[in-house]
Amino acid sequence: MQELLLYGYTVSNYSNKVKLALLLKNIPFKEKRVSPGENDKNINGSPAGLIPYIQHDDFFLSDSQAICEYLEAAFPDSQPLIPSDAKQAAKMRQVISIIETIIDSAARRIYTKKLYSTAPPREVFEEANNRLQRGVRALNRMNCFSNSAILGPNLTLADCAAMATLPLVEEALSDYATESLLKDLSGYSSYYERRMQEEPFIEVENARQKTFRGLARRAGK
């Protein structure tokens, strides 16, 4: 069996979500950098031309959640990142959905300034921030950051999604307000500090910061 290949990009939160899962599960893999848009050339790897995607022997798969679920099933002896309890597993997927479809999708509408030196219109910012804060309130209602990990004592894919997305969102939006737009996310700062004592999260976050700040400098920020 060949070593698993992860095709992705250091700043991509979806690539980093998969990378965190691989590191936490201690699955051997090799990274192949693919810049956004470049993957249109490889229809086998990603039918929609999106990153990340993986190659495991002759099997290709894209979509970060699909990949993470595949890793859980294909490597049953590795550290589990999906709770065995059906209700907890469903809660995990709910948290991931809030992070990715509400917070991340809202943030993407307004952090173009940081990377491309083009600020969105004020009304776009306000609309997107309202949606982002809706996601923050949802995570607070679920007490996501009140324990050592999001769903209790054990790390899950929800933690991979959170640590891949929330630090990026916070940094990318730092030009837009004197305070973090995630300042009302209860317990998040302490949660981030805990995760940054653990090697997989240190590795991924440090690499993300280095690449992101390089992009921001080139954009003149």
Segments from the language model and where they lie:
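Extracytoplasmic ligand-binding clamshell segments of periplasmic binding protein
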Residues: 151, 204-205
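Acidic/histidine-enriched, glycine/proline-rich intrinsically disordered or flexible terminal extensions
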Residues: 207-221
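GST-like domain detector, emphasizing the conserved glutathione-binding G-site
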Residues: 1-126, 145, 150
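A late-sequence structural motif
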Residues: 198-199, 204
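Juxtamembrane helix-loop transition sites at the ends of transmembrane segments
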Residues: 29, 121, 180, 220-221
